Amino acid sequence: MGTPLRRSRRLEGLNPLSLENLPDPEVSRAKRALVDFKSNPEETRELESPRVPPLDLVSPQPQPETSPESPCPKQDAGFGSPQRQPEPHPGSLQLHQDLGLDSPAGQTESNPESPQREQSSKLSPTQDSEVAHAKEEVIPRSPEPCPGQQAPGPEPSQPAQELAFQAPSSPERQLEPSKLPPAGESVTGSLDLKKRVIASPQAPASKKLKEELPVIPKGKPKSGRVWKDRSKKRFSQMVQDKPLRTSWQRKMKERQERKLAKDFARHLEEEKQRRRQEKKERRAENLRRRLENERKAEIVQVIRNPAKLKKAKKKQLRSIQKRDTLALLQKQPPQRPVAKV
């Protein structure tokens, strides 16, 4: 990997830091500082000289945005470390601070006016609190390198956008300090949660199997004859109890309904009788009118000679009727006396 474009004169003898040659987190800070001092004596001399301005020591790369879930990239980017460590550790946090000696900015703990102190003072109080909470978190230890290896120089750090992208998607994201469970309950809580997640899909499956089974009704005949069903009774065997007392309003309402029903039945009967009587009277009137019309239309001849009656045939005798001829005689005065029979 190539070195960055802007490098100071004191970083010429440093070797790049690789993931395989990570320093031992258990080595003390004083011992590691002594080894770095022996390897690069010119570096400390230049830091002690007042001619070197502190602004040139700042890393040219911007600080990436950090989230409360991943405080490790914030410290690495602020101190100019080359690459984000696998996971933060109380021992590894101390290691990150000590690695500032080998960073491209050439920072050491002996110089109080170094850019490391300036950057730490510029941090907001919220970031300081998040860093303090991150130190208190319980995290598995990082892999340790061989004790005989020396802490080499760092590699060029990754871009700020890549660090910010990897921070929220870390698989082993830790909980916030306010939500941390007790030490004894952390493992049991996760196991109970897994059991619930595994047991939940099995419960609905068993219920579905029970619901799918056909329910056989007891006592129901196969032919479907309802009157043979034990649970049902015949209409004649059903007993419908009347209420013990009925309200006065209900009594009056029922009485009014009965009265209206009787009046309507009587009205229908009277209407039927009236129609029958009218029909009978009309028939009698028609008969009387017919007879009157026949008499008006017939031709009457008064037979005064009895000899004609003796000579008349049976057919003629049928049409002869004995009537009162006084009215006719009065209308038509007789011309001769009527023959006495």
From Swiss-Prot:
It is found in: Nucleus; Chromosome; Nucleus, Nucleolus. The keyword Phosphoprotein applies. The modification Phosphothreonine is found at T66. Residues 26-49, 130-139, 254-298 have a biased composition (Basic and acidic residues). The modification Citrulline is found at R323. The modification Phosphoserine is found at S18, S59, S67, S70, S81, S92, S103, S114, S124, S142, S169, S170, S200. Residues 261-304 form a coiled coil. Residues 219-235, 307-317 have a biased composition (Basic residues). Keywords: Chromosome, Citrullination, Coiled coil, Nucleus, Phosphoprotein. Residues 105-114 have a biased composition (Polar residues). Residues 64-73 have a biased composition (Low complexity). Citrullinated by PADI4. Residues 1-341 are annotated as: Disordered. Transmembrane segments: none annotated. GO terms for cellular component: nucleolus; nucleus. The keyword Hydrolase does not apply. Required for proper chromosome segregation during mitosis and error-free mitotic progression. PANTHER family: COILED-COIL DOMAIN-CONTAINING PROTEIN 86. This is Coiled-coil domain-containing protein 86. It comes from Rattus norvegicus (Rat). The gene is Ccdc86.
